[in-house]
Regions:
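A generic structural signal for tightly packed, nonpolar segments enriched in small/aliphatic residues
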Residues: 1-131
Length: 131
């Protein structure tokens, strides 16, 4: 069992990866490898990004369990993924794909003519078929 979520979560991932790759954040190396491999096979590019306890300080709060914004600045996409990870229970293998740069295409390409790209459908379908 594992969880994979896709979201147009942050504009920060666009600063990091542009419209060429989705950002992959995961607590599980095996699941990450499956996603990276599937992405290559279906031509939906994925780049693994850091997820580490050292980023927790950016969303810790003195007034609540946590805060959903990093007031210090920087590491926006990683901070958002750290926030999501806090809702994953019992060390369940989990991956988050930040697809903000991939969900829409101004110019189109080999697999679409512009507009909504459907990014992730082929990737998730391949992973599901292999289960």
């Amino acid at each position: 069992k594992f969880i994979v979520d896709l979201a147009t979560l942050t504009g920060a991932i666009i600063v990091s990866l542009g419209s060429e790759y989705a950002g992959l954040f995961s607590n599980d190396d095996k699941l990450s490898s499956q996603i990276l491999e599937a992405g290559k096979k279906v031509e939906e590019k994925v780049w693994r990004m850091p997820l580490h306890k050292n980023f927790d300080k950016l969303i810790n709060s003195k007034n609540a369990d946590m805060q959903n914004i990093n007031y210090v600045g920087g590491a926006g996409s990683t901070t958002a993924a750290q926030f999501l990870q806090r809702f994953i229970l019992n060390k369940t293998p989990w991956a988050h794909l930040d697809i903000a740069g991939m969900a829409f295409s101004k110019y189109g390409g080999a697999l679409n003519s512009g507009g909504a790209t459907g990014y992730g459908v082929r990737l998730l379908s391949l992973i599901a078929v292999k289960q």
